[in-house]
Amino acid sequence: MANNHQYPGIQPFQHPNASSIDLPRGFAPPMNFQFLPTIQAPQSEQVARLSSQNFQCVGRGGTVLSIGYPPQSYAPQLLQSMHHSHERPSQLNQVQVQHVPLGPPTLISQPNVSIASGTSLHQPYVQTPDIGMPGFGGPRALFSYPSATSYEGSRVPPQVTGPSIHSQAQQRASIIHTSAESSIMNPTFEQPKAAFLKPLPSQKALTDWVEHTSADGRKYFFNKRTKKSTWEKPVELMTLFERADARTDWKEHSSPDGRKYYYNKITKQSTWTMPEEMKIVREQAEIASVQGPHAEGIIDASEVLTRSDTASTAAPTGLPSQTSTSEGVEKLTLTSDLKQPASVPGSSSPVENVDRVQMSADETSQLCDTSETDGLSVPVTETSAATLVEKDEISVGNSGDSDDMSTKNANQGSGSGPKESQKPMVESEKVESQTEEKQIHQESFSFNNKLEAVDVFKSLLKSAKVGSDWTWEQAMREIINDKRYGALRTLGERKQAFNEFLLQTKRAAEEERLARQKKLYEDFKRMLEECVELTPSTRWSKTVTMFEDDERFKALEREKDRRNIFEDHVSELKEKGRVKALEDRKRNIIEYKRFLESCNFIKPNSQWRKVQDRLEVDERCSRLEKIDQLEIFQEYLRDLEREEEEKKKIQKEELKKVERKHRDEFHGLLDEHIATGELTAKTIWRDYLMKVKDLPVYSAIASNSSGATPKDLFEDAVEDLKKRDHELKSQIKDVLKLRKVNLSAGSTFDEFKVSISEDIGFPLIPDVRLKLVFDDLLERAKEKEEKEARKQTRQTEKLVDMLRSFKDITASSSWEELKHLVEGSEKCSTIGDESFRKRCFEDYVSLLKEQSNRIKQNKKVPEDVREEHDKGRDKYGREKDRVRERDSDDHHKKGAAGKYNHDMNEPHGKERRRSGRDSHNRHRERHTSVKENDTDHFKESHKAGGGHKKSRHQRGWVSEAEVEGKEKRRRKEEAREHTKEEELEDGECGRY
């Protein structure tokens, strides 16, 4: 419990008549008050005595404490001062007390002031008028104290408003003796150095800053008092960790995804992990918040309180009525226009700046009202400023006395009560507070950071040989006189370093114990390993008899530890034996495999029963079991089979490479022949085979056992040529249409090349291929001309047949005379144009003239000639039948040969049908021409006998039948020709 901080809040009040009591270390330091009243005290009236009612004062958070205080009397001087104050009530009523928050709560108490139990002053009762007394007995002006828990913030003194009342020094009444009593009634408050103070914002400063958000979402802060704004968060609004981080170069930020990272504003570096420097300051801040508001960041309050208590106990015993303030009352600072005097030179206290509360002749002191109903009059000290400063400095100087002096003063001021009745904690706190007075260092320390100071303090603990089981009080007695004790300025830091040192010491001791125990284990294990007689089957009882005299066996005291190490050693021996057996077996297997590899008589198809006798002769075979030998032998045979398969696979791959090379060479030969024109799309395999069968390239590919044959490659090349020729033919057709070049039966190859030379590059196309395309196009042009000629012949015959139906047309008729007759006929007007119809008309008239002349000549021919003519006609009929049969045979022959000369654009069947139709059409044309000649001959023969009636009758009848038959044949031929025209139009592909 001595190592823990006491709660720095309100402590229970103890009666001053008890023995001397030291304040706990966590108590706030007392405050030095100097009261200089500015109002002339009245002399006629007496001051009212103190009420027996309990003294009440506002503590932390506004809680009113009821403290039992015995009735006492004031000094006679107080009566005179109060008399003057009653004489001038008008002036006193004008005095207004303005109470301002005084910062953090501070205890204004002096419980360690010793008051004799029998001491008392006469204090007659005087009725005090309600005139607004500015002291404790005046109007109930209750001081309000903020609930902040630190000393930071601005200290605002109470302001006195109203007219200033000037008086002379002789009008002031002193109510406290100016000797030792002055130090009793003026407790010292030692202000820490400015370097050690870390001011926290006051409640008023916190309300001055207002947080706002800009249009872009950024936060800024505005001060209502100074009318200034800033992007940076003010120190007054920072949290505990933010204030701690402000002492470092690192700053915490958050990424868009919420992760926290840390940025160093000096080195411009960022990291995802918290730097060690930030961790240290945050831990210190957290420890300070746990230990109390005065544990970190300011000088340790317990140290200041201890010094103040020491100074108070060192002073002689004063009047009991002059101990006025209680625990829990906050620090009250009263300032004046006078300058604060400097501290006494040569003072050994580390706290240099001491607050001295002074009041000038123009100011009045303000104290808290200790009751809500009845106020208690507390005397006000009146003395000169020089005397007060001197006494205050003496009090501060006395705080550095030795332990003996402090103890002596405490004993003198203690009241009745045995020493044994004091509690242990109070006694320990007293010892600690007394030993704390020795922290007056003659030398100052300077460290780069706090870690160095902690290391120095830990080195002090180490040099003092502080044990891991020591308490803080034990360590204090050993290290308090060392100058390194002041390396850490606050008691919280020293205790934290002390606890860390104890933890490190315990850890080091534990590590040392483990190392010593480990060495004993290793020695015992080494003893077992050195013994050759130990085997995996050795028993523990036998082991004990073997090593019972060995020092290493005795050093290990616990029987359980010995047996555990022995069992572990036996397990290791078993494991080593098993591993050794496995290694031996593995080595024997490897040697046996090498032996099998050296035997040339073992083949992939060898049998174990045939080679077993030959293998067992070798010693390497006898090292293994029979089953192991058989398994290894079978595995070796499988390896041989795999090797043989791999060899075959490699040979097969090499053969495939050779055959692929032969095919590539034959491909090159085909490409070469295509380039020279020896191989075209119409080349036949039998013809090509006769050319290449004697070449070595063909012989090489013919020897291939797999892959494509030479014929397959040839057919692929021909098929590719057909596709390329078809593309070339389409391209040339487009060029001819673009150039408007028409091929005719009389066109030559040179003319054809010239017409397409500008659009097609001939160096890339052999003339052989180009000649094939030209021949196909020329044949197509001839077929087209023949078709046009046949079409015109049919139209001529059709028109002539129509002209024969007109009776008005004779051999002497002319076109101009009968033009209206021909043009007026619908059938005639649809056939050709006018010039064509005129030409046909003139041809028909010429035919009539020839017939007329032939008839005239036939009249002169004798009868026997006509009979010969009839015989010739029969002979002509038989000849006609023979021609028909011959045409039919030619048709079949051409149909059989058509499959080799079919068009590349049409299927073979369609090409054969076309060739059949062509031969049929040619046969029909020959037949028609023969028939027409026969008809003409028949007509001429009848015309020759036109003089007889029978001949004339017969001629007229034949003429009508011939006309009807011709008309029917004409219609059939027109339908047939129309179908043929549709098949052979220019837009169709036609023959290749």
Curated annotation (Swiss-Prot):
Main location: nucleus
Basic residues bias spans: 910-926, 945-955
Biological processes per GO annotation: mRNA cis splicing, via spliceosome; RNA splicing
Single annotated GO MF: RNA polymerase binding
Name of protein: Pre-mRNA-processing protein 40B
Composition bias type Acidic residues, residue spans: 982-992
GO CC list: nucleus
Biased composition (Basic and acidic residues): 420-441, 860-892, 900-909, 927-943, 963-981
Cysteine pairs bridged by disulfides in the record: none
Annotated consequence of substituting W231A: Decreased binding to CTD
Assembly behavior: Interacts (via the WW domains) with the phosphorylated C-terminal domain of NRPB1 (via CTD domain).
Coiled coil stretches, renumbered: 958-986
Tissue specificity note: Expressed in roots, shoots, rosette leaves, cauline leaves, stems and flowers.
Listed PROSITE patterns: FF, WW_DOMAIN_1, WW_DOMAIN_2
Superkingdom of this protein's organism: Eukaryota
